[in-house]
Each structure stands twice: as structure tokens, then as C-alpha cells.
């Protein structure tokens, strides 16, 4: 049976991640509060941001920006979108 979590993005019980997505306290918190569905959506959005804004992940400012966007995305706050992107209905 899949591990279930109360997803902070969708505000409902959904299947959780198999492993923490990153090390440390932040990874543990995400593991306990973010669903597999929300995390997969974030990864897709993150890829769009990296490509659209041509972010260099070796740059600490780019990593900070992505971390801020991740928090906004997962907390249903206003987050940056790729220019011209129209989400599927």
C-alpha cells in the first residue's frame, strides 16, 4: 500500500513520495507534507523555469530563486510562470 500524506498544495490525502526529495530538514518536511502528484508537477514547472530563464544551477542566486519558487508553488501562492505558457485545462 502506498504511503499517504496530507498534501499542502492540494489540501487532501494523496500518495506521498517514496523518499525525501532532498537531504536535510527541508527534504524531511517536503517528504511529510507534499504528495507525489504535487512534486511531479513542481519538477515539470521547475524545468520550464530553468529553460525559459536560462538558469545556471551552479549559480547560488539561481538555486535561491528556484527554492523560493518551489515554496510559492507548493503553498499555492503566486509563482513565476514561463512566458507564453498556457496550462492545460
UniProtKB/Swiss-Prot annotation:
Instruction: Please give the NCBIfam families that the UniProt record associates with this protein.
Output: PRK05408.1
Alphabetic keyword roster: Iron
Among InterPro entries, the record links this protein to: Fe_traffick_prot_YggX, Fe_traffick_prot_YggX_sf
Q: Which PANTHER family match?
A: FE(2+)-TRAFFICKING PROTEIN-RELATED
Q: What is this protein called?
A: Probable Fe(2+)-trafficking protein
Q: Which GO terms describe its cellular component?
A: cytosol
| Its job | Could be a mediator in iron transactions between iron acquisition and iron-requiring processes, such as synthesis and/or repair of Fe-S clusters in biosynthetic enzymes.
Pfam families listed in its UniProt record: Iron_traffic
Query: Which family is it part of?
Result: Belongs to the Fe(2+)-trafficking protein family.
| HAMAP family per the UniProt record, alphabetical | Fe_traffic_YggX
Amino acid at each position: 500500500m502506498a504511503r499517504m500524506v496530507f498534501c499542502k498544495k492540494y489540501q487532501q490525502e494523496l500518495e506521498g513520495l517514496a523518499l525525501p526529495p532532498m537531504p536535510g530538514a527541508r527534504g524531511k518536511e517536503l517528504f511529510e507534507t507534499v504528495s507525489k502528484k504535487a512534486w511531479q508537477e513542481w519538477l515539470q514547472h521547475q524545468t520550464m523555469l530553468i529553460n525559459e530563464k536560462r538558469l545556471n544551477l551552479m549559480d547560488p542566486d539561481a538555486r535561491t530563486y528556484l527554492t523560493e519558487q518551489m515554496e510559492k508553488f507548493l503553498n499555492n501562492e503566486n509563482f513565476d510562470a514561463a512566458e507564453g505558457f498556457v496550462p492545460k485545462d
